[in-house]
Amino acid sequence: MVNTFRILLINGPNLNLLGIREPHIYGYEALSDVVANLYKTSESLGIHMDHFQSNAEHELIECIHKSYKNSDFIIINPAAFTHTSIALRDAFLSVNIAFIEVHLSNIHIREKFRYHSYLSDIALGVICGFGVYGYHCALHMAHKYLSKKINK
């Protein structure tokens, strides 16, 4: 029997404007195109991927809560909520699902208020500064992590 991993991709505030908002920082590709490419990659890896984007913190929290028992792994770009949301952190601690934090830009070379993340210390890993390729890297790492976990 082949296991199909269930990975949830979550994108936070303003990422719906990817390709429009400060493209010199975040890139020129629309979120819909990024997600479409990730769906193709996930299919090639035998992964069932779902995607959710919201500008509202409470909707992201609800999405994380609903992932309990429905997702094996989460990839999240929390965007600005990275630096402000204790509630997102608590949501992850509540469901106990491994996750990778992704940022399109390198948050450590930008404004000082972006240096701190409320999620990094509880994430399996953090990928930042590689644009949309960071999502692909996270997807491959999630697959590798889940494959190792299932083979133990």
From Swiss-Prot:
Reported function: Catalyzes a trans-dehydration via an enolate intermediate.
The protein's name in its UniProt record: 3-dehydroquinate dehydratase
EC number in record: 4.2.1.10
Organism: Blochmanniella pennsylvanica (strain BPEN)
A GO molecular-function descriptor: 3-dehydroquinate dehydratase activity
Major enzyme class: lyase
Substrates-to-products reaction catalysed: 3-dehydroquinate = 3-dehydroshikimate + H2O
Sequence similarity: Belongs to the type-II 3-dehydroquinase family.
Superkingdom, natural source: Bacteria
Chain sites annotated for binding substrate: N77, H83, D90, L104, S105, R114
Gene3D superfamilies: Dehydroquinase, class II
